[in-house]
C-alpha cells in the first residue's frame, strides 16, 4: 500500500469510529443550562424592576396630585374663610343703603346724619371690597340663574326676553363665588 492509500484508510477508520460523549460535552451542556437559568432570572428581575419603576412613577404622580389638591384646598379655605362673616354683613350694607334711600334729603336737620350714613356706607363698601366682597350689577344684563333670583316677570317689548329690568335686592359675590343672588325682575316677550 502506498502512502496515499494508507491515509485514506486511516481516515475511514477514524470516521467509522463512534464518538462517545466526553466530559467536555457534559460541561458545555451544564453551562448552557446555567446560562439559560441565569437569563431567565435576569428577565424576571428586569420585569420586576420595570413594575417597581412604574409603581414608583405612579406613587410620585399620586403624591403630586395630592399635594396640588391640598394646596387648592388651602387656597380655597383662605379665599372663602370670610364667606359666613361676609354673608352676615350683607344685611348691614342693605340697611345703610335703605336708610340713605328713604331719608328726607330736604331736611336740613337730617343732612349731617345722611352724610354720616353715606360716609359709613362708602367706608364699609371699600373695606369689604378689599377682601373680595363685591356687589353684582345685573341691570340690563341677561338673566343668569347662578347669580340672579327672578322675583317676577314683566312684559317688555323694548328689551330682549330674559333681561334683568329691575333689581329689588343687590346680590354679592366673594372672590367670584356668589354668596347671595340678586333679586330681580326679568323681562318677557309681549303676549
Swiss-Prot record:
GO molecular function: adenyl-nucleotide exchange factor activity; protein homodimerization activity; protein-folding chaperone binding; unfolded protein binding
Subcellular location: Cytoplasm
Keyword Chaperone: yes
GO biological process: protein folding
Gene3D superfamilies, A to Z: 3.90.20.20, Head domain of nucleotide exchange factor GrpE
Family that this chain belongs to: Belongs to the GrpE family.
Function: Participates actively in the response to hyperosmotic and heat shock by preventing the aggregation of stress-denatured proteins, in association with DnaK and GrpE. It is the nucleotide exchange factor for DnaK and may function as a thermosensor. Unfolded proteins bind initially to DnaJ; upon interaction with the DnaJ-bound protein, DnaK hydrolyzes its bound ATP, resulting in the formation of a stable complex. GrpE releases ADP from DnaK; ATP binding to DnaK triggers the release of the substrate protein, thus completing the reaction cycle.
Protein name: Protein GrpE
Source organism per UniProt: Aeromonas salmonicida (strain A449)
Gene, per the UniProt record: grpE
